Amino acid sequence: MNTTPRTRREFLGQVGQGTLIATLGGGLASELGLTRAVADDAPDRLDFGALEPLVGLMQDTPVDQLLPRLVDQLHSGTALRDLVAAGALANARTFGGEDYVGFHTIMAHAPAYHMAMEMPAGLEALPVFKVLYRNTNRIHEHGGRKSEVLHPVQPLAVTEGRVGGELLQEAMRRKDMNAAEQTFAALAAGPPEDAFNHLLYAVQDHTDVHRVVLPYRAWDLLGLIGKEQAHTLLRQSVRYCVKAESWSGAASYGEPRQLLPKLLEEHQLLGRAPGGRKAEDVWVDQFSQTLFKSTPSQAAAAAAAALAEGMAPADIGEAITLAANQLILRDMGRRPQEEVAGKPPGSVHGDSIGVHACDSANAWRNMARAGNTRNCFASLILGAYQVAQDRIERGGDFLNWEPLPVAYHVKGLRSTGPASLLKEAEEAIRGNLQAHAAAVIHRYGELGHDPKEAFALMRRYAVSEDGALHAEKFYRTVTEEFNSTRVAFRWRHLTALARVTASEFGRPAAGMAEAWELLKA
């Protein structure tokens, strides 16, 4: 955990207090003043030790002074990784997973750092500065330190003989934020991997995109900034899930939470190891089409059956992400009534159904890799459920809409060399020609040209353009999926990225012009 370090005696004492509160019940304990006494003994503010000065810089610096301060930090020897860590911790402490812009921004921290590792020498900090600028700006809009959501929490003893994740799930379903927070605090005192696996019980009650992507991006971030921060970053998802129980439409959450245990039991997946039966290309392609065309419950059942047959989880995950990819390639774009500032009719960037579906499928696939056996199976079943749900959620005739690239654009291409094709792709991006950009990158891959150069082009605009909160995350989603998808299908992901990049061009990200000048100097 990442509050001020405690001795073993202090921790056991806190657990003992939690046990008494649990025994008496929250209401009686409150009447007796026990919960207040426990709270009075605890510090009121999270402290991040050696990182605290940097975290404070992220929260307190006026946004118009932030970028020069960050450059000074780099020049004084501060690692870029530490700036990312400080930004993430400042975000978590301020928003606690409860602010729309806030949780989108923390989900962009790890992708921005991964992008930084791909940038030209001297410009590595650009994608990180983009996200940190957005981060500090939103912290000030939210009210700064006085509006912090996360505070130290006392652990509540977990009942012996019970699965911690089930207890967390029960507290969430009761909408009991205090019990959920205290239960997770106790679970997070153990190995971070165990805390993550317990958390997924609560996450798996529904397939809302933010509920799904937030824990995966937090887990990815822990690999960069240290797993000792697991409690702070993962408890954001606890709070998100509890809050979601009170949202309008929460009653419709019922199907996943009923369907998942049914399928796990029906296919006898609990207690068995994942299979290792590798799939041929034809199977992956056909299975992705099955998922795409099915109802959500049918898709979930198909994934459970494939797991029971011993199909390799990686291949099932690959099919799920390819099904999600179709939602970008087939999308007709935002309808006139859906336009908002920065997202005009016909656009597919930002929170489009395709970007959301791909980010969700990527998260489920990665949580299947990171989780234990139960959560591997559960993540793939729910990933299949969600991609089918995403196809129908916002309407549209996705089954009959033609995927990009269409023959008209492909036949019109005359260039074959890599440089000329990339130039044509860039012209299409700058002209917001989504279909043409997709066709050019499809042809570029079909001819066997170097994907690194295509990614470099897309990355340039993922950094420079605003992207409506999704540019960095979606770029990273495509990078991960391209690298883990077989050769026969991987260029579908880059083709989708080309389309999204063309959609988002023309809306420069705040702070990027200043950051560019500072780093060049």
What are the roles of these predicted feature ranges?
Residues 2-521:
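Mature, well-folded catalytic/scaffold domains that follow N-terminal targeting or propeptide regions
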